Amino acid sequence: MCKRNNDALFFTCSLIEQLGRSLHMRRGKVAAELGEAGIQTLYRNADILHCEPIEKVADDVITEFSLQGGDFDNLAEARYTVPDVWTMGKVYARLIEDVSDEDNIVETILQVFTSWIDSLLSDYNAAFYYQPRDYIAECYRQKTCLLYTSPSP
């Protein structure tokens, strides 16, 4: 498990969330388009980037990486209060902290965002994103949502 309360990880995850919202893209697609090198750059420079409003940083990243918009708008589809960018950044960061080793954080960021769990975390009409961090991490490890499975006999 990597270090808890990793500010660079929290900011990087929040920035990917902001990029997804700004571009109307799935967060996994944003991470895939940034690639490991792009995520590494954002992660390494998070202590500087966080000094500006996240919306401006997102605009700069969109320009720098020539990111194009999509048609995924989970905010418009939400029937309930939408969690803010920082809340979702914290959810992703905690999951990555729980499933990553200290030396492969950037690789794990890419793996988590591009995995099956991204669609569950991006569904703000479901209860998944605000489940306990241990539960979300175990679902990720098991590669399935454990919430609706029946207990073994």
Question: Residues of each region from the PLM?
Answer:
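Amphipathic protein-protein interaction modules
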Residues: 69-116
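A general alpha-helix detector
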Residues: 11-18, 90-94
